[in-house]
């Protein structure tokens, strides 16, 4: 491919709307073009990268007996109503009507459609297990698209769905997809951290996210300094040291006037107590029901953990009007003396220690409040957001450190969420002729997100540095100068290189500086240069984009030298945390 005939229009200026490295560089390198907020066209270079990622996905999923399908983006609303997702999902789901006023949705995932297929065809134990996957457009009405391809409204997703006769078979299959994902990300040049993930209201018996550690990531996860514990902060637990209290039975609870006390710091000074002796009461609405979450003052409530414990679809902070209707006052909330309100306590507040709590009235607090004596919670659970520096629950020795990351993929033991009788009702007949419920797993990877993540991990001040396996071209050939002998030699090299490598030849009538800077910006892994000086010596110059190493070799040894370089650019699977299969 000749550069002069290709669709490449690089930008020198940084686009004002771009902030993250991948967004800036993919725009500057003419890989993508914005159409609307969170909607991008993949230009020829970006399309080539996406297609190479898709090829890796297909190779690895086919290797574990996956079968590719294509499902429609336009789904009848009836299917989504059967699974309840039509009602459970908020504004991020596009809902539309056709000219006959029939309701449809634009699919953000395809559990409903694939389960409908399964219940029609997978009717016998002889048909199971099976894994079906697709690489298809997904559409989500993201409230705040950001960071270029990292959070968009339309994208390609590889979503896979496995169907099993029982949970044991799903458990046996799960390591195969987990390991395939590790190979996919490694082949794409990405350093991945598999972490334990939150299963949410979906239930099931296991879930993992695959994270790329990045300061531009939206997700947070913890890593233990001593053991292999890795978990999303929505799931992670830290060891919570109990409140030190060794006195006699606490004195009776008493109300104390606290005029002008508004903050935690004010309370600590007023009552002369540490933060862990305060009760923090946070009001939520869980599927429309008022719930009070009670936690120690030195911790914060995780809304995700609360939702999971309550098996609630939607949990939000309770609005002021909801509190006012019950005579409650934000800032002075307390679990004491309330009736008809569900109270869930974090495990950190159970025990004999007395606490300071709100008085459920303006400018009043209670002192010497004891859980179980002065109020009775509906339930106790782990509600605490993990903190950087907490002790590890897995080994009890290590310290948990919080990292930021980009979620590359998610594997999930879905169970019977969609195959249950109250949902899509997918069953089969076992060997004895008895009807059984189909068990599912679901798995997903965003294609454009992998592209952007590769740039986030592999870039420098000069531009991108794409991994060899997914780069739009493997080699870029630059001819420096317009003398006939240079162009003739470059043409000969282009033909030789093109027979072995995916090559683009920069044949433009541009200065050496422009060509070399563009080569760095585009991130092609290997650059080969022909110039007058090199030609006189019968040599060519090779630069490895990733390392910056420059090699000058005889022209007749070019292919042999490239072979060694390419071997060094291949991914290594050594040390990856594969699951036993």
UniProtKB/Swiss-Prot annotation:
Homodimer. Transmembrane segments: none annotated. Belongs to the class-II aminoacyl-tRNA synthetase family. ProS type 1 subfamily. It comes from Syntrophobacter fumaroxidans (strain DSM 10017 / MPOB). This is Proline--tRNA ligase. Consists of three domains: the N-terminal catalytic domain, the editing domain and the C-terminal anticodon-binding domain. Catalyzes the attachment of proline to tRNA(Pro) in a two-step reaction: proline is first activated by ATP to form Pro-AMP and then transferred to the acceptor end of tRNA(Pro). As ProRS can inadvertently accommodate and process non-cognate amino acids such as alanine and cysteine, to avoid such errors it has two additional distinct editing activities against alanine. One activity is designated as 'pretransfer' editing and involves the tRNA(Pro)-independent hydrolysis of activated Ala-AMP. Its EC number is 6.1.1.15. It is found in: Cytoplasm.
């Amino acid at each position: 491919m000749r550069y002069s005939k290709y669709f490449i229009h690089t930008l020198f200026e940084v686009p004002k709307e771009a902030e993250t490295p991948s967004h800036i560089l993919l725009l500057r390198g003419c890989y993508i073009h914005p159409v609307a907020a969170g909607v991008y066209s993949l230009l020829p270079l970006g399309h080539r990268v996406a297609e190479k990622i898709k090829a890796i996905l297909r190779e690895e999923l086919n290797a574990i007996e996956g079968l590719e399908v294509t499902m429609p983006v336009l789904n009848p609303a009836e299917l989504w109503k059967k699974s309840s997702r039509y009602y459970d999902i908020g504004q991020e789901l596009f809902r539309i009507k056709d000219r006959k006023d029939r309701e449809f949705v634009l699919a953000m995932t395809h559990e409903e459609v694939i389960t409908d297929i399964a219940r029609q065809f997978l009717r016998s134990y002889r048909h199971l297990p099976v894994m079906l996957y697709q690489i298809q457009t997904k559409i989500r009405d993201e409230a705040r698209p950001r960071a270029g391809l990292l959070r968009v409204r339309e994208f390609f997703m590889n979503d896979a769905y496995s169907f099993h006769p029982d949970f044991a078979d799903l458990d046996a299959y799960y390591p195969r997809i987990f390991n395939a994902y590790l190979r996919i990300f490694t082949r794409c040049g990405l350093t991945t951290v598999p972490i334990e993930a939150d299963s949410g209201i979906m239930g099931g018996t296991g879930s993992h996210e695959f994270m790329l550690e990045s300061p531009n990531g939206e997700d947070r996860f913890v890593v233990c300094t001593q053991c292999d514990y890795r978990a999303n902060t929505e799931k992670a637990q830290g060891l919570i040291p109990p409140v030190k209290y060794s006195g006699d039975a606490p004195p009776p609870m008493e109300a104390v006037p606290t005029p002008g006390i508004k903050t935690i710091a004010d309370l600590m000074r007023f009552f002369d107590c540490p933060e862990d002796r305060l009760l923090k009461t946070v009001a939520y609405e869980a599927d429309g029901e008022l719930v009070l979450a009670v936690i120690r003052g030195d911790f914060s409530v995780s809304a995700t953990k609360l939702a999971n414990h309550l098996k609630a679809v939607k949990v939000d902070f309770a609005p002021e009007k909801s509190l006012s209707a019950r005579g409650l006052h934000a800032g002075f909330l307390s679990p004491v003396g309330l009736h008809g309100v569900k109270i869930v306590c974090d495990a950190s507040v159970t025990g004999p220690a007395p606490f300071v709590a709100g008085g459920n009235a303006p400018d009043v607090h209670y002192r010497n409040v004891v859980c179980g004596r002065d109020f009775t919670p509906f339930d106790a659970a782990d509600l605490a957001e993990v903190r950087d520096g907490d002790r590890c629950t897995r080994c009890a020795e290590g310290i948990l450190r919080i990292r930021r990351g980009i979620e590359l993929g998610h594997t999930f033991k879905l169970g019977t969420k969609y195959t249950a009788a109250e949902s899509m009702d997918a069953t089969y007949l076992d060997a004895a002729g008895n009807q059984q419920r189909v068990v599912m797993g679901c798995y997903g990877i965003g294609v454009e997100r992998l592209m952007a993540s590769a740039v986030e991990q592999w870039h420098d001040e000069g531009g991108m540095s794409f991994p060899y396996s997914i780069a739009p071209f493997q080699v870029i050939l630059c001819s420096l100068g317009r003398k006939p002998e240079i162009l003739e030699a470059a043409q000969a090299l282009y033909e030789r290189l093109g027979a072995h490598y995916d090559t683009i030849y920069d044949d433009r009538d541009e200065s050496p500086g422009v060509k070399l800077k563009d080569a760095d910006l585009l991130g092609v892994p290997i650059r080969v240069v022909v110039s007058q000086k090199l030609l006189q010596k019968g040599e060519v110059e090779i630069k490895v984009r990733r390392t910056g190493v420059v090699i000058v070799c005889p022209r007749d040894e070019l292919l042999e030298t490239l072979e060694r370089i390419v071997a060094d650019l291949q991914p290594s699977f050594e040390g990856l945390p594969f699951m036993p299969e």
